[in-house]
Every structure is written in C-alpha cells, then in structure tokens.
C-alpha cells in the first residue's frame, strides 16, 4: 500500500530527488494555491489573499504554468497526497499561520514541493518568501515617534504568529531607542480580520484612553479601527495617528487614506511562484526576505 511504501522509505531515510521526479512523471504544469475552507464566498476579508493570488498567477503564467485554487479543511492533511500523487499539481503555495502548521509539517514529511508566504518556522527546512517584519515594525513606530506622539499603541495580529512577533520586536526596539518603556495597556491583538480590528481598538481605548497613536498590523484591521475611533469621538490624525501594514489597494481609499508599511503584495506573489518553480528545477531551498517601505498618507 501507499502507506507501507512511505514507511519503508522513511525507515531507510529515502529522499525524493525533486528534479528527477519531474523527469519521471508527466508534469501537470499546474500549481495549487491552498486556502482554508472557512467560508465559501470571497469578501473584503480575503483582500490580502486575492492580491497575492494575482501576483502568483502572473508569475506562473509567465513560465507556462496554471494556478489551481484549492479549498481545504484546516484540520486535514491528506489533501496534499490526493493532489500530488494523482499528478493534478506539481506543487503547492501556502499562506502560513499557526493554524496551518500541521499542513507545513505534513508537506515537509512527505517531501512535497511547496513554498510558504511568511517567516520560516525555526528548525524546519522549506522554501519561503516573507516581508521584513522587524524593519516594518521599526519604521511604523519611528514615524509615530518622530511626529511627536507619546502614547503609541500596538494593535497586532495573533500573538503566536511569527510575523506579528517580529513586528512587535520592531515596535519595542523603536520605543527603547527613544528611551521609552513598554506599557501593557497599549498592547492588544486581533486576528487580521476587519472586525477584529474594531474589537481590539475598543479594548485599547478602554485600557489606555490617553493613547495618541496606534500601529496596526494590517490595513484590513485599520479600516474598522478608524471607524471605532470615530465612534469614540477621536479624530485621525489630530487626536490619534494611525500607521497600518501591507498597503493593499484599499489603503489609499480609506477615510482618511492610510499611512502604511508597504509589503508589495503583488510582487510577493510573483516571487512565491518563481521561487517554487526554481525549486522544482533545482531542488534548492530558498528563503527570501523582501524589503518594506513606509508610505506616508493622511492618517499619520
């Protein structure tokens, strides 16, 4: 059986030679973009994924590949065998998160060709592309310090996510360099969704009503956080300055337009595609960190 063959291969520490495998199998010239089946309709909450998907599609098509969007149950891992063993796809592109760590572990163990958006998990070897989250956190916080803000809050994504931890480290370093100490009342977390931005902003206003700035870990969370600030009678940027993250297409069209850390999401998608195809050809694992930049608009 398939499981018995895998067990024997593992026992003898058999390693798949990716380029050789490509020669021995008929290739589908299709790459799977893996999303979670939390809901069936796309919405504004999917904007980051949609924009990175556009870059992936562009990078694949330039190299004669198609993209297949695969919705999977976040608790299941057998989907990878189904798509790879039947030759439907040649590899996978994933958006990393702690909810997907089982997926990454399973793909590493079956030695499937894949690449992940997000910082690589320590001790695991696989291809990845991520933004420079530490620099992003520093840039955002330094901008708020330089604009004269004293009580700068951090509104993060999930605290267990590596990219959020790196952004927090950048925030903390910038505060320390300015001779300021951390205040736990100025720290709250959402989950990168728009609605969580409003909830976390409300929490911050309750914990630290004197805050005069906030660094928010995504444009989506920032959009709803702006509305929450208005509901509390706070003007942006006069009363509270806001710097967000990603520079998605909506950032320039919010009210007010968001000052944000640009990750160049479409380029990230293109790099994910190109680096995975390079891995399929060479078997060489790459971990790419993309530079980020501060885009100044009207919110800070």
What are these regions (language model features)?
Residues 11-17, 72-77, 226:
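Short gly/ser/thr-rich secondary-structure transition/capping motifs
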Residues 151, 182-186, 236-242:
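Short acidic capping loops at alpha-helix termini that bridge into adjacent secondary structure
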Residues 38-50, 69-77, 129-139, 155-202, ...:
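Hinge/beta->alpha junction and helix N-cap segments in small-molecule ligand-binding domains
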Residues 26-142, 204-206, 210, 220:
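Alpha-helical recognition/docking segments in bacterial nutrient-uptake
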Residues 1-29:
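N-terminal helix-turn-helix DNA-binding module of bacterial transcription factors
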Residues 202-300:
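Flexible loop/turn connectors
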